[in-house]
Swiss-Prot record:
GO cellular component, one term: plasma membrane
Function: The products of the Gag polyproteins of infectious retroviruses perform highly complex orchestrated tasks during the assembly, budding, maturation, and infection stages of the viral replication cycle. During viral assembly, the proteins form membrane associations and self-associations that ultimately result in budding of an immature virion from the infected cell. Gag precursors also function during viral assembly to selectively bind and package two plus strands of genomic RNA. Endogenous Gag proteins may have kept, lost or modified their original function during evolution.
PROSITE patterns according to UniProt: ZF_CCHC (PS50158)
Subcellular location: Cell membrane
Additional free-text comment from the UniProt record: Intergenic, closest flanking genes being RPL24 and FLJ23047.
Gene3D superfamilies for this protein: 1.10.1200.30, Human Immunodeficiency Virus Type 1 Capsid Protein (1.10.375.10), Retroviral GAG p10 protein (1.10.150.490), Zinc finger, CCHC-type (4.10.60.10)
Protein name in UniProt: Endogenous retrovirus group K member 5 Gag polyprotein
Disulfide bonds: none
Domain notes: HERV-K Gag polyprotein contains regions homologous to the matrix (MA), capsid (CA) and nucleocapsid (NC) proteins from infectious retroviruses. Evidence suggests that HERV-K(HML-2) Gag polyprotein can be cleaved into mature MA, CA and NC under certain circumstances. However, the exact boundaries as well as the size of processed Gag proteins have not been precisely determined yet.
Gene name per UniProt: ERVK-5
Keywords per UniProt: Cell membrane, ERV, Lipoprotein, Membrane, Metal-binding, Myristate, Repeat, Transposable element, Zinc, Zinc-finger
PTM comment, free text: Myristoylation is essential for retroviral assembly. Alteration of the glycine residue leads to a block in the budding of particles and an accumulation of Gag inside the cell. Specific enzymatic cleavages may yield mature proteins.
GO MF annotations in UniProt: nucleic acid binding; structural molecule activity; zinc ion binding
Lipidation (N-myristoyl glycine): 2
């Protein structure tokens, strides 16, 4: 491990020294150990990283992407590595203001020839704008002698500028104009939104150090009642570069489509070339514009369209809500309805909102139901008298006439309303992962309220059945067939008897109101005693009593089977004689438990039927000395030798001859 550290330190020695000096000038201190660890990780997962280092911000962004990809594969990236990478990336951002691009003259000759052959253009001006891949992106690893280190601390820690009361002048004096409602020091502007590609500068004007997002055409227009945006707002700090005041782009629906929003569309295309624009979606908002320079004098106010971006907070709320609660939860549906009815969402807006909020499978479902709804709506438009001139391309935002934002922004109100209804219906049919099941498998639980069961049934039918009439019939059928027995008994008198024009499901819910509560249970008990039910029908007991033969009760609860009947049956059973001989003695026709014979039919003794006493414990042999009985006539004989207590029995058994009798004890 120590050899690896020393090898990495020697390999990137000059670059490490420069990075440490760069961070120190900016007021940041990073230990050499952490930097060596960072470059070890870079060397492991980014083998393309040059030994002499690089100041190109795109290279460090690429390092971050590859480290993220390595982390997704299961590799452990220490937290200090991420912190050091972010600090170095932020420290290198000020160096991207003066970019050096490779000119077309420095490219190989085959590059220009290939470009001319592909495009068919011979002018040098057009060739410069259409150079191929040999003209690389800006190379930033140039000389570091002219670095302005005073900007670095303001970029990494902008709050220090407030404490010191100073900041770098990032915008020339010619750019100073009254700013919007939220003046910020130029040092606090986020530098992550700077363009990374080379832009051809105008030599007649001084170059601007930073370009801000959003573009000038999309920035906020301050209200006219105050010079600084709202009453009581303090003036801008002296010596700080304000935001330039942008003009507002307005689209006239009555004008031709070719001239609508040309500046806006050009800004969007340029922003896409300079950076990622996926999070900045555009929606169309109607506003009432007073007569001004753009219109004739004395003209009344007219409604015009204005494009505004989706806020990041709104996109984040929808994304987190879909992930946590589901795409069709009440929270998401309420939020989506408010967005849809509060704005003029074009097909491009709906597609962008679905892509940024739904998963891949959910977006595929949304797109499928969207296309299906468009086809049905087009058939309705053609069948209407007079015919509505709204085709499928307009509702889907496709085709040569409706594929761009400019073209969709001037859509008529009726088309916007149809797109809104179709997309909301398609969103409602999205199945969350793991929740798809057939509608006939939805059954009411024994204790589930009937309205909850009907709500689950309608929700599943809404997502799986497109036709409204078929969905209504199936819901009414399943609302009775899949209900529990209590609700079925309450609904049965209403089935097929609901008057025309009255909602069947509503009548079912009214009939099942209160089922399962304490009052309903008390009513059931009272009606069971009277033989009635909720529907007014007598519920009879179908089984027959085996004792009396009547219907309505069992034998164990038969009122005829009283105590006297039980005694009589017991006496009859006792007096009944067996059909064969006694199995014990074999001599008479009586029961075995009533047999008193002492001998069987063959004369063999039988064990008595009387109860015996408790059995005696077994006697122990050999534990005490054996005292043999000596008859009286053998008292003169010589006594036997003394035998040990435990061996006397075994020696007597081994003796072949009869031993001499022992003298009897005196009487």
């Amino acid at each position: 491990m120590g050899q690896t550290k020393s090898k990495t330190k020697s390999k990137y020695a000059s670059y490490l020294s420069f990075i440490k000096i760069l961070l120190k000038r900016g007021g940041v201190r990073v230990s050499t150990k952490n930097l060596i660890k960072l470059f070890q990780i870079i060397e492991q997962f980014c083998p393309w990283f040059p030994e002499q280092g690089t100041l190109d911000l795109k290279d460090w962004k690429r390092i971050g992407e590859e480290l993220k990809q390595a982390g997704r594969k299961g590799n452990i990236i220490p937290l200090t590595v991420w912190n050091d990478w972010a600090i170095i990336k932020a420290a290198l951002e000020p160096f991207q203001t003066k970019e050096d691009s490779v000119s077309v003259s420095d490219a190989p000759g085959s590059c220009v020839i290939d470009c001319n052959e592909k495009t068919g253009r011979k002018s040098q001006k057009e060739t410069e704008s259409l150079h191929c891949e040999y003209v690389t992106e800006p190379v930033m690893a140039q000389s570091t002698q002219n670095v302005d280190y005073n900007q670095l601390q303001g970029v990494i820690y902008p709050e220090t500028l407030k404490l010191e009361g100073k900041g770098p002048e990032l915008v020339g004096p010619s750019e100073s104009k009254p700013r919007g409602p939220s003046p910020l020091p130029a040092g606090q502007v986020p530098v992550t939104l700077q363009p990374q590609t080379q832009v051809k500068e105008n030599k007649t004007q001084p170059p601007v150090a930073y370009q801000y997002w959003p573009p000038a055409e999309l920035q906020y227009l301050p209200p006219p009642e105050s010079q600084y945006g709202y009453p009581g707002m303090p003036p801008a700090l002296q010596g700080r570069a304000p935001y330039p005041q942008p003009p507002t782009v307005r689209l006239n629906p009555t004008a031709s489509r070719s001239g609508q929003g040309g500046t806006l569309h050009a800004v969007i295309d340029e922003a896409r070339k300079q950076g990622d624009l996926e999070a900045w979606r555009f929606l169309v908002i109607l506003q009432l514009v007073q007569a001004g320079e753009e219109t004739q004098v004395g003209a009344p106010a007219r409604a015009e369209t204005r494009c505004e971006p989706f806020t990041m907070k709104m996109l984040k709320d929808i994304k987190e809500g879909v992930k946590q609660y589901g795409s069709n939860s009440p929270y998401i549906r309420t939020l989506l309805d408010s967005i849809a009815h509060g704005n003029r969402l074009t097909p491009y807006d709906w597609e962008s909102l679905a892509k940024s909020s739904l998963s891949s499978s959910q977006y595929l479902q949304f797109k499928t139901w969207w296309i299906d709804g468009v086809q049905e709506q087009v058939r309705k438009n053609q069948a209407t008298k007079p015919t509505v001139n709204i085709d499928a391309d307009q509702l889907l935002g496709t085709g040569p006439n409706w594929s761009t934002i400019n073209q969709q922004s001037v859509m008529q109100n009726e088309a916007i309303e149809q797109v809104r209804a179709i997309c909301l219906r398609a969103w409602g049919k999205i199945q969350d992962p793991g929740t798809a099941f057939p509608i006939n498998s939805i059954r009411q639980g024994s204790k589930e309220p009937y309205p909850d069961f009907v709500a689950r049934l309608q929700d599943a039918a809404q997502k799986s059945i497109t036709d409204d009439n078929a969905r209504k019939v199936i819901v009414e059928l399943m609302a009775y067939e899949n209900a529990n027995p209590e609700c079925q008994s309450a609904i049965k008198p209403l089935k097929g008897k609901v008057p025309a024009g009255v909602d069947v499901i509503t009548e079912y819910v009214k009939a099942c109101d209160g089922i399962g509560g304490a009052m309903h249970k008390a009513m059931l008990m009272a009606q069971a005693m009277r033989g009635l039910t909720l529907g007014g029908q007598v519920r009879t007991f179908g089984k027959k009593c085996y004792n009396c033969g009547q219907i309505g009760h069992l034998k164990r609860s038969c009122p005829v089977l009283n105590k006297q009947n039980i005694i009589n049956q017991a006496i009859t059973a006792k007096n009944k004689k067996p059909s064969g001989l006694c199995p014990k003695c074999g001599k008479g026709k009586h029961w075995a438990n009533q047999c008193h014979s002492k001998f069987d039919k063959d004369g063999q003794p039988l064990s008595g039927n009387r109860k015996r006493g408790q059995p005696q414990a077994p006697q122990q042999t050999g534990a005490f000395p054996v005292q043999l009985f000596v008859p009286q006539g053998f008292q003169g004989q010589q006594p036997l030798q003394k035998i040990p207590p435990l061996q006397g029995v075994s020696q007597l058994q081994q003796s072949n001859s009869c031993p001499a009798p022992q003298q009897a004890a005196p009487q």
